[in-house]
Amino acid sequence: MTELSGKVALVTGASRGIGYGVAEALVARGDRVCITGRNEDALKEAVDALGADRVIGVAGKAHDEAHQAEAVARVMEAFGRVDYLVNNAGTNPVFGPIADLDLNVARKVFETNVISALGFAQRTWHAWQKDNGGAIVNIASVAGIAPSPFIAAYGVSKAALINLTQQLAHEFAPKVRVNAIAPAVVKTKFAQALYEGREEEAAAAYPLGRLGVPSDIGGAAAFLTSGQSDWVTGQTLVVDGGIFLNAGVG
């Protein structure tokens, strides 16, 4: 157990990948955690792997307001508090030029990547954080900081999430700190198409010589929900293996 033992976190989109890595890091330091995900079977497997004595799961779609309400209600019922929210649930269902982007698909991306994060933030604020404090971490992307060809809807949604982070940080202060993490390519099923069959080539572009893994983001989230970051809010922590260094100057 650590200094944070007894704290409670809600992590969305956490049955696998980055969300699971975040939940794993928080459980390891002594937190109790509620994880969400769309697939009930995958969620149960994740709960069992993380430890059913400290973790509960609530299945549903992140953009569904009824699911948001249920998840927050369940974590309050099970643990009596919700100190931390990590908005990780996201989608990137389309690849192609922005000129041909289906606007209905773009709306779906924004519903999941931005509006759901706002919905969960509102609900955790009213349920606990408004009176008791806490921290929120939004999982954004380097695609929200620099142009990312052929995944425009995803990139624009993550840019919006970064701005939402700043808005929430301003309005929720001083009780609640709100920050974002912007990963580059992390080895998950979600990002598999970006490196499958060419991982060595993809990794060579990174000054640190490898792609990210979920625990890299878990460590960053653990920092941003710890006392070590008590004077940090409204910021975006880029966790990118140094890929932005390649832009150079001039």
Where are the regions a protein language model picked out?
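Residue(s) in the substrate-gating loop at a strand-loop-helix junction
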Residues: 141
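Conserved glycine-rich cofactor-binding loop
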Residues: 15-17
